[in-house]
Amino acid sequence: ETFYRDETGDDSLFEDEFLRPQIDDYLRFFYWANDKLNLANFGDTPDRIVKHQHVIYYLSYRFDCKKLFDRQDLMSDGPNEYEDFLFYPLVLALKDHGYPDPPLLGICPHTGYAMCRTGYGKNDRFFAIKTGESWNHNHLDAGSFILSDKNMEIAIDSGTCNYGRAEYRGYYTTPQAHNIVLLNGQGPDADMIESGTKFS
């Protein structure tokens, strides 16, 4: 947020009209598989559950949304990192105000994600797709998707790889390492690998 504000002079990232929609976006990313609640994981972040936890705690507290905290709490073992402990005691006191589930179809235009589902229960179908550019991601994975149905994962993204391994540049960042549909055996142009969405 500081980098963005310094580069653009725009300090709106912490205003309610920007942050409140993030609750629905996070709620859309949760899905059931193997009797566990999961968070759709595109890319090479090893543990989305931990990496986003303090953000979910903050949003839950700021907008009094116990539903968001409860879903995160089903996935995690509680606070893990310093930032988590800043908000965890606050979210424990939240009361359930019946925050509605977001619509079954959701598009995040600024990140290029889209999700659709038949519902929010364990046996509902969930589909998410990653499109467009991703700032600082550097994988040729536009079009990769996640699909689950009846509490089972059917298609997931490829997971993580150590940056130091030869396979990282040679294979892992290529379209073939991701579950995307290739056209005539081809995916996104290799020249795009170093370009991401920039602020200026």
Predicted regions, residues:
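Carbohydrate-active enzyme catalytic cores, enriched for enzymes
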Residues: 2-155
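Active-site rim segments in enzyme catalytic domains, especially the processed small/beta chain
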Residues: 140-200
